[in-house]
Amino acid sequence: MIKILFICHGNICRSTMAESVMTYLVEKEGLADKFYINSAATSREEIGNGVHHGTVAKLKKEGIPVIPHRAVQMTLNDYEEYDYLIGMDTENIRNMQRISGGDPDEKIYKLLTFAGSGLDVADPWYTGDFEATYRDVLAGCKGLLEIGRAHV
């Protein structure tokens, strides 16, 4: 089983969107039993809060079920438990490395790396552009699915 943890700053917009999109993609491909998918934050600011209404609206518009979720913070234990820890931007990656004590097992990636880009997924909390975030998340998740498919 491939274990994936999507991570963003607050765990209410981008990482929850990626969790829902990736879950949808693996279910659509009949691979749900081969993947364990979750999400977390690097900060404590939104702990306990649900998925942002903008993320919910965009996912519903795309026909993607929203995974019920309450924001949690990434821990060192998560680094040990997951195969892939996927951050949304450079700041997330830096904070993930701080939480995990570096990346000795090379498990930390930026999502758009899987779409052939080193760019950040813009945070719709600030941009208000959930459409652009969705396009990036979908591209990254599709690329990650191809990598995962080769290992299941």
Residue ranges and their predicted role:
Residues 1-81, 149:
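Conserved active-site segments centered on acidic
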Residues 84, 90-149:
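Phosphate-binding/catalytic loops
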Residues 8, 59, 86-87, 137:
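Hydrophobic structural packing positions in well-ordered secondary structure
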